[in-house]
Regions:
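Short hydrophobic beta-strand that contains or immediately precedes a catalytic carboxylate
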Residues: 8-9
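Short acidic, Gly/Ser-rich segments with clustered Asp/Glu that frequently serve as metal-coordination loops
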Residues: 12-18
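Active-site-adjacent betaalpha module
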Residues: 1-5, 28-36, 53-169
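Von Willebrand factor
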Residues: 33-49
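Short amphipathic alpha-helical segment that frequently serves as the phosphate-/nucleotide-binding helix
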Residues: 19-27
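Glycine/Thr-rich phosphate-binding loops of Rossmann-like dinucleotide-binding domains
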Residues: 17, 50-51
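Catalytic metal-binding/acid-base residues of hydrolase active sites
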Residues: 12, 46-47, 107, 133
Length: 169
C-alpha cells in the first residue's frame, strides 16, 4: 500500500494534555502502518509569531511527545494550520505517489480540520482515524467528525483501519 500514508499531526509537548487519551491508539496505528508498509509521516507545528509562547522552534514544547513512536525520518514542519502549507510535504506526497492519507493527532478543530479540507481540495483521499485524534475542546469532536465527512473524508476507527475497511488501494 505504497500509495497510502499515516500522517501524525502535531503530537508535541505544547499540545493539549488530551493526547494521552489517544497515544496508545496512535502508536498502534503506527505499528500497523509499518507492518503493512504504509508511509509514516510526522508533522510538527512551529509557531513563528512574535509574542507567542507555544510551539516555539528549538523548545521542549515544539518537540514530539515522548510517548509517540517515531519509526521514520519523514518529518515536516509547518507554520500554518494545514500540513500542505509545507511545500516539502506536498512534494513528498507527489514524488511517492501517495493518494490516500490517514490522519491522526491534534487539534481536531484546527490543524486536522485545515489539513483535511486542503487535502480533499487537492484531490487526496483522506481518512480520519476518529479514535486517534483529539482536541483542546473535546466537546467539539462529534462536530468535527461530521465536518470531515461533509468534506468528503472517510471517518474510521483504528479497528476499522486495521481490519482494512476503507483502506485506500
Amino acid at each position: 500500500m505504497k500509495n497510502s500514508a499515516l500522517v501524525v499531526i502535531d503530537l508535541q509537548n505544547d499540545i493539549t494534555k488530551h493526547y494521552r487519551e489517544i497515544i496508545e491508539n496512535v502508536n498502534a496505528a503506527i505499528d500497523w502502518a509499518v507492518e503493512k508498509e504504509l508511509w509514516v509521516i510526522y508533522i510538527q507545528h512551529n509557531n513563528l509569531s512574535a509574542g507567542t509562547r507555544t510551539f516555539k522552534p528549538g523548545t521542549r514544547g515544539a518537540e514530539l511527545v515522548p510517548e509517540l513512536k517515531v519509526v521514520s525520518d519523514h518529518m515536516f514542519t509547518k507554520a500554518k494550520s494545514s500540513a500542505l502549507t509545507n511545500e516539502s510535504f506536498a512534494a513528498f506526497l507527489q514524488e511517492h505517489g501517495i493518494t490516500h492519507c490517514y490522519l491522526a493527532g491534534a487539534d481536531a478543530a484546527a490543524c486536522i480540520k485545515s489539513t483535511c479540507f486542503n487535502m480533499r481540495k487537492s484531490g487526496y483521499a483522506v481518512h480520519v482515524l476518529s479514535d486517534c485524534i483529539t482536541s483542546y475542546d473535546k466537546k467539539k469532536l462529534p462536530e468535527m467528525l461530521a465536518y470531515y465527512a461533509s468534506k468528503g473524508c472517510s471517518v474510521t476507527t483504528l479497528q476499522e483501519f486495521v481490519e482494512g475497511i476503507g483502506i485506500g488501494r
